[in-house]
């Protein structure tokens, strides 16, 4: 009788121990399932978006024909166009994709930097020089270069010092983007997130997928814009807003075709 009672007590104790363990396993299993699902969703983000997958818009619309097999709509901005086969090699494709995104971001910042001083100057804000390609030349003037026209901010008189600061600042940003450093571990150097996304704009996978498309589309436009700013500076010697005003005032006399036909080499 005592032995039977002891065995019954042991069985009850075993059941009472198993219940919490099973409950814990169930909860942990659910957490792991949620984590796994969240990671899976993040990997396949954009699968329901019109900008991804086989049915995404192509570079020639319905006349695009068959696109290369390696352009399958997995990445943002893929319109199926690679006539020269520049991205047929997977490693080259990955490298070109990273270069395009990074150059697009710098171009967007550059375009903003070209337009903003000229726009502020037209609004009454005084600058030493508002035209973007003339501003840097002030460093060679007798008084040097004052940032925002204020000598109490940054007063620069050495082009080498400015060059060194640019290398350090831009190099630090790129280094943190690729290697992490003080900003934490980086799992994706193209979209590092973390401290590079303080507002948490990319927390939702679907929103993140759409933002990737918007970024690369605007970045490509910005790269073309910067190229146009360079050409305008060489041909007209004016800033982009001044060129725009001239074109709006007299579109026939101020356009690319008119300047091209009037161009004389050596003059």
Curated annotation (Swiss-Prot):
Give binding positions for chlorophyll b 2: 105, 154, 183
| UniProt-annotated binding residues for chlorophyll a 4 | 218
Fetch the InterPro entries from UniProt. Answer: Chloro_AB-bd_pln, Chloroa_b-bind
Transit peptide residues are 1-37
Assembly information from the UniProt record: The LHC complex consists of chlorophyll a-b binding proteins.
Q: What residues bind chlorophyll a 3, as annotated?
A: 138, 148, 215
Can you say what this protein is called?
A: Chlorophyll a-b binding protein, chloroplastic
Membrane topology type, per the record?
Multi-pass membrane protein
- Source species: Physcomitrium patens (Spreading-leaved earth moss)
> Where do the annotations place chlorophyll b 3 binding?
158, 174
Family per UniProt? Belongs to the light-harvesting chlorophyll a/b-binding (LHC) protein family.
């Amino acid at each position: 009788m005592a032995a039977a009672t002891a065995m019954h007590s042991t069985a009850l104790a075993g059941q009472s121990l198993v219940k919490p363990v099973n409950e814990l396993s169930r909860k942990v299993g659910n957490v792991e399932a949620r984590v796994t699902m969240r990671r899976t969703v993040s990997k396949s983000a954009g699968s329901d978006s019109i900008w991804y997958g086989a049915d995404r818009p192509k570079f020639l619309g319905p006349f695009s024909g068959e696109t290369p097999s390696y352009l399958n709509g997995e990445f943002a901005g893929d319109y199926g166009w690679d006539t020269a086969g520049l991205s047929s090699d997977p490693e080259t494709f990955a490298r070109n994709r990273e270069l395009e995104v990074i150059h697009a971001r710098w171009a967007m910042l550059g375009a903003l930097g070209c337009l903003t001083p000229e726009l502020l100057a037209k609004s009454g804000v005084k600058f030493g020089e508002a035209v973007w390609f003339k501003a840097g030349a002030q460093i060679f003037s007798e008084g040097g270069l004052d940032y925002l026209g204020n000598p109490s901010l940054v007063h620069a008189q050495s082009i080498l010092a400015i060059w060194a600061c640019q290398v350090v600042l831009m190099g630090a940003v790129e280094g943190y983007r690729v290697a992490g450093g003080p900003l934490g571990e980086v799992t994706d150097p193209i979209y590092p997130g973390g401290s590079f996304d303080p507002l948490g704009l990319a927390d939702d996978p679907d929103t993140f997928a759409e933002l990737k498309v918007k970024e690369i589309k605007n970045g490509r436009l910005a790269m073309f814009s910067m190229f146009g700013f360079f050409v305008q500076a060489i041909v007209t010697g004016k800033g982009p807003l001044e060129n725009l005003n001239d074109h709006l005032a007299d579109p026939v006399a101020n356009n690319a075709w008119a300047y091209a036909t009037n161009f004389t080499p050596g003059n």
